[in-house]
Curated annotation (Swiss-Prot):
Protein name as annotated: Ribonuclease HII
Cofactor note: Manganese or magnesium. Binds 1 divalent metal ion per monomer in the absence of substrate. May bind a second metal ion after substrate binding.
Enzyme class label: hydrolase
Listed cofactors: Mn(2+); Mg(2+)
Binding site for a divalent metal cation: D59, E60, D163
Gene Ontology CC entries for this record: cytoplasm; ribonuclease H2 complex
GO BP: any one term: DNA replication, removal of RNA primer
Entry's EC annotation: 3.1.26.4
Amino acid sequence: MVIEQSIYSSSQSTGTAQANLELPLSSPLHLSGRINTKALFSPDNQSQSGGFEFEIGVDEVGRGPLYGSVVVAAAILPKAWSGETEVGLLQDTPLAILTDSKKLTERKREKLFEPVKQHALAYLVVEVPAGVIDEINILQATILGMRVACEQLMVEITKVWRDASELPTAPSTPLGFKLLIDGNKVPDLDEARLATHGICLADMTVTQPAGMVKFCAEAWVKGDARHNAIAAASVLAKVYRDRQLIADGARYPGYGLEGHKGYPTKAHVEAIARLGVLPEHRRSFKPVQQAIEGTLAGTHYS
């Protein structure tokens, strides 16, 4: 099952990033991903209790650049492969070299990209463009991307789970999710929207309707180096964005986007001063603001 979607409103899929956010968004979020329905609900991925509890690793890339989107990815690995990195569950698998994408060379990340997509039970990549970053700020844009990734992947999997015609197991088999978020904070999800799809936060203090799909969420500091599912998401996000910047480097010669990937290097800032601001530059970031105001000359950032 392939996922391809564009979202023009932050409430269309996730609820507002913050209470005073104006809707709709001026630029669309783009979602792309895949669910391997046969593998996802195979007996190999059932828990000892007979149900399914999927660990969804979530990571982002691109908060610091002056140019382009921030990209968030979410990934579910097979149960036998999903766990803390130090346990060594990926040894002798096609993902044996998987770790935090920042510790991998570009060549190794590229080598892992297709195998991660091929062997993941499900994955989703969310692209939050520069226009949205300028509209709601980079922090809220990152949170929004994480919300979309978490919610939409849970919703799509729950839809498949409820469709008995696509499953090798009965749809009454319990289903749950554990969200593993790279960083020190779990984004607030739109629980009202999730409830309309029969998904709720696991809470032992509240009586919940029977048959609800439950989820919990954890923040993992440096999680991309600590958990295989987060590391897989990290590689997907990094390679997706890098490929985008390499393509844009060919579209916009002279800016060096294919090299610095949009980050505020001296060469990038000098190129902006010399060649001008591109549509995908983040106008809310200081060096870009200075270029627009004509005050960038002689100033560089590293």
